[in-house]
A protein has these predicted regions:
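Active-site core segments that coordinate phosphate-bearing ligands/cofactors
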Residues: 1-3, 7-8, 12-30, 45-47, ...
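A conserved helix-loop-beta module that forms one wall/lid of the active-site cleft
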Residues: 30-41
């Protein structure tokens, strides 16, 4: 049983400096390494299906499966925010502001998180647990609701149309 390094780094059991399970935390919790998955790179591929999985999916035994990474790490990669001078902001139910770095960063006040993207890069950022509420507020206060209603559209549809009309990278912003 295995887990990719980025997901492992989100568990609270991971030592970001050794990029392995943290011995002190394991000792404190009474958890052994054998109870935890092996940590692998997100690009690790495996093949092989159980007979039941093969029958249910119709996939060939040699179909490769890649471990991947957690969504926050991949969002930085997806928008090209892989350097320290580029920030990724993602908004969904929750939201986060993240920047990639070539070394782990520890916030002594524990305001920021730091997770591994892979063995050479980390993502440092701050979470917001109400990203959807922020979008709702912006749509309800910045979109002309009368105009939206006259076009038989919701304020959210209009907000998304405005966002979609801005070319990617306009003034350095990717949305």
């Amino acid at each position: 049983f295995r887990v990719d390094i980025s997901t492992a780094s989100c568990t609270g059991f991971f030592n970001m400096h050794t990029q392995d399970w943290d011995d002190e935390i394991l000792k404190l919790t009474g958890i052994t390494r054998s109870q935890l998955p092996e940590i692998v790179d997100g690009t690790t591929k495996e093949t092989g299906l159980t007979p039941a999985a093969k029958q249910a999916t119709g996939l060939d035994d040699e179909t490769p499966f890649v471990y991947g990474a957690f969504d926050g790490a991949l969002s930085n990669l997806g928008v090209g925010a892989t350097r320290q001078d580029t920030v990724a902001i993602t908004i969904g139910t929750s939201a986060a502001v993240r920047v990639a770095t070539d070394h782990p960063v520890v916030d002594p006040e524990q305001r920021l998180f730091c997770y591994s993207i892979d063995r050479q890069r980390w993502v440092v950022g701050g979470p917001l647990n109400n990203g959807g509420d922020v979008f709702q507020w912006a749509a309800n206060h910045l979109v002309d609701s009368s105009a939206a209603k006259s076009e038989d559209k919701s304020v959210y549809d209009v907000a998304n149309e405005v966002i979609a009309s801005v070319p990617a990278g306009a003034h350095g912003l990717l949305f």
